[in-house]
């Protein structure tokens, strides 16, 4: 059986740093649900860090962009909501 959430999965980007424990938790949470994501290390890529700053107005991580819905911090409920109510 095909899971329609997989077919219609929104683009997911996780802005993170290697030393951030909440970033690790967020990425693990997505992986456990079979959600593919683009992992952006903002400590190593300043242009992507600026992109994150432009989207959020702040430099804290993790930041998740799920189909255009931005979530600051690791918030399971917000992640689930964004995945279920994708654009």
Which sequence ranges carry the predicted segments?
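Local sequence-structure signature of Cys/Sec-based thiol-disulfide redox active-site neighborhoods
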Residues: 2-36
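Major-groove DNA-recognition helix of helix-turn-helix-type DNA-binding domains
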Residues: 54-60
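A short, hydrophobic beta-strand/beta-hairpin element that forms part of a small beta-sheet core
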Residues: 62-72
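Short alpha-helical
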Residues: 21, 47, 78
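Thiol-/selenol-based redox modules, centered on thioredoxin-like
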Residues: 79-87
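Thiol-based oxidoreductase modules, predominantly thioredoxin-like and allied folds used
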Residues: 36-48, 58
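Glycine-/small-residue-rich active-site loops that bind phosphorylated ligands and cofactors
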Residues: 21, 44, 71
